[in-house]
């Protein structure tokens, strides 16, 4: 060991001495004595490794308390951090999909703070059913006879098939064998549910007679799957639920539908593309309809199944139902969200998903122009900051070909180097409240459709 190495080792402080320093008192109060000591030991090991490798001390050895504070502060951050979503995708799966209404947030907080009547009937002091209150709401909204709630729509489809078609065949059009994110495929779900898939028709055209010819003594269901995350256009043919229900009645085979996104209101009244609604399919005679709670409905992650009472009863009594049931927080948020639909005149104001989807391009353009000046003053030395028209998307597999006119702030490096865009995007991801945009066509785009808190946005970007 050289004299220089010995000298560097001698500069490393003893843990006891560091802990006696006044700057460590607050750290010990905040993070606990055990964790602070554990980290100091780790840092001493790191420092010794640096000395052995490069014959120098780490820069942070000049202020141990500051480095400990920085590391423990970062460590204490939640893995689920709030972000500002300016990607242009409203229901961004990776960012948690639907924002919850204030009523839903309050309902969840109340359900977490105290015991609730989850499975308790106040009328006779007996055991109740956890889905009952929501089932009544869903029946009122959709016109269904009964309803069942599980933890997501994939679970809803699995339960629906396992409880009504295990060991039997399910007839589905070839053009509706969808795959959603995470390689969730309808054929795979059928296998897990113990069903046999019977494909009919072709990718682009399926006729009523295709279903008729497929039905046999082992057929349990005729199934429709709404292709909410892709669109087949051109020379196409598909039969709707009403026609399939008529065929099912003739052949004595129930019809079920996986709607996926599942809007409970006619979106066209807000200037958005229309999506099929559960209540329309119930009115057409479909026996079971499944859809998501956290997409166009604007609530928490949940799988909702509405339909005929005798079919729902089979789902409720199946062993999978207990494994897939929703917890009290989900049920509280979903109930509060569904109650908003009882007052449709205020829905676009109180439901964040609908509020963001219905923001006009003109309003967003004015907002972008208002924010452009301070950002150009701050970033103008390196980037040209401009207001540009753009197209937002709904996201989460909803209305895949439809786009919403919007406006964005774009950042273009004066030297044209793409690495500067990557660096800027990385800097924004490290902010206390990360700002998430997207890089496209030599620019960093911040689509402002989902920006409601301008003050927080500017506080982050002008740091």
From Swiss-Prot:
Gene Ontology CC, one term: cytoplasm
Keyword Transcription part of the UniProt annotation: no
Its EC number(s): 2.9.1.1
Catalytic activity: L-seryl-tRNA(Sec) + selenophosphate + H(+) = L-selenocysteinyl-tRNA(Sec) + phosphate
UniProt pathway: Aminoacyl-tRNA biosynthesis; selenocysteinyl-tRNA(Sec) biosynthesis; selenocysteinyl-tRNA(Sec) from L-seryl-tRNA(Sec) (bacterial route): step 1/1
Recorded family membership: Belongs to the SelA family.
Protein name: L-seryl-tRNA(Sec) selenium transferase
Source species: Escherichia coli (strain K12 / MC4100 / BW2952)
The organism's taxonomic lineage, starting at the top: Bacteria, Pseudomonadati, Pseudomonadota, Gammaproteobacteria, Enterobacterales
């Amino acid at each position: 060991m050289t004299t220089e190495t010995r000298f560097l080792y001698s500069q490393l402080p003893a843990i006891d001495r560091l802990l006696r320093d006044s700057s460590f008192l607050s750290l010990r109060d905040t993070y606990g004595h055990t964790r602070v000591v554990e980290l100091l030991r780790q840092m001493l090991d790191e420092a010794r490794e640096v000395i052995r490798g490069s014959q120098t001390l780490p820069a942070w050895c000049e202020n141990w308390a500051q480095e400990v504070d920085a590391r423990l502060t970062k460590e204490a951050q939640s893995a689920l951090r709030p972000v500002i979503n300016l990607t242009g995708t409203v229901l961004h799966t990776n960012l948690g999909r639907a924002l919850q209404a204030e009523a839903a947030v309050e309902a969840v907080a109340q359900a977490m703070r105290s015991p609730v009547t989850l499975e308790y009937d106040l009328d006779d002091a007996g055991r109740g059913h956890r889905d009952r209150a929501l089932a009544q709401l869903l029946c009122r909204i959709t016109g269904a006879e009964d309803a069942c709630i599980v933890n997501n729509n994939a679970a809803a489809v699995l339960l629906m098939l396992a409880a009504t078609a295990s060991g039997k065949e399910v007839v589905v059009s070839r053009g509706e064998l969808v795959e959603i994110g995470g390689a969730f495929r309808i054929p795979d779900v059928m296998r897990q549910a113990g069903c046999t898939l019977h494909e009919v028709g072709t990718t682009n055209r399926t006729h009523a007679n295709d279903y008729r010819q497929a039905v046999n003594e082992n057929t349990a269901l005729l199934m429709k799957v709404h292709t909410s995350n892709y669109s087949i256009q051109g020379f196409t043919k598909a039969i709707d639920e009403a026609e399939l229900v008529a065929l099912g009645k003739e052949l004595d085979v129930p019809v079920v539908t996986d709607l996926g996104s599942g809007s409970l209101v006619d979106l066209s009244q807000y200037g958005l593309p229309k999506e099929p609604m559960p209540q329309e399919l119930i009115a057409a005679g479909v026996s079971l309809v499944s859809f998501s709670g956290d997409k166009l409905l604007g609530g928490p992650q949940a799988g909702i199944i509405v339909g005929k009472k005798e079919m729902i009863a089979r789902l409720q009594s199946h062993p999978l139902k207990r494994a897939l049931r929703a917890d009290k927080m989900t049920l509280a948020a979903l109930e509060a969200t569904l109650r908003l639909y009882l007052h449709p005149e205020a829905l676009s104001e109180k439901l964040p998903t609908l509020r963001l989807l219905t923001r006009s391009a003109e309003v967003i353009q004015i907002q972008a122009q208002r924010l452009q000046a301070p950002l150009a003053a701050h970033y103008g030395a390196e980037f040209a900051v401009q207001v540009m028209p753009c197209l937002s998307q709904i996201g989460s597999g909803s209305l895949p070909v439809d786009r919403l006119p919007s406006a964005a702030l774009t950042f273009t490096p004066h030297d044209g180097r793409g690495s500067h865009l990557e660096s800027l995007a990385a800097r924004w991801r490290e902010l206390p409240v990360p700002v998430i945009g997207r890089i496209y066509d030599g620019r960093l785009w911040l689509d402002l459709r989902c920006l409601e808190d301008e003050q927080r946005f500017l506080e982050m970007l002008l740091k």
